[in-house]
């Protein structure tokens, strides 16, 4: 299902291949025979964004986190389809990674869409494995494209998730006043 979805999104002259020779299939975007003279624009963009990496240094590029609401929803769905889990009852979802930065980026992405997220760390180094970061997510929108996950999603919240930034617009330019409180960090509640 993911393979078909990605294939349909590719520009003309490209196709998606799967190498199943390893325990974890590797997907590659390759040029079709009639497009061999051109540079692979997907590989060029992956390199430009610094995404040609693996393992515990993966991340979400800043420009992706600052995309439109629709782009950020699609990003979350792509991440959740490939690395997300959903409980049998459909009310608990999480994203698992061995990259601390990617876990923090997913948390930030969820917050930007009005959801709640928290990261739990599981140290599996004593078993010869990496540290695992599990991002527990609560969000109103359905974060899945995959049918088996999408149909099971049944969010239940103890409190409403309402924090999100829809847009930022210039209002006016004017003088501002700065307030400070007599404490070492100068913080206060309003």
Place the predicted regions along the sequence by residue.
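Internal intein/HINT superfamily modules and their associated LAGLIDADG
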Residues: 1-190
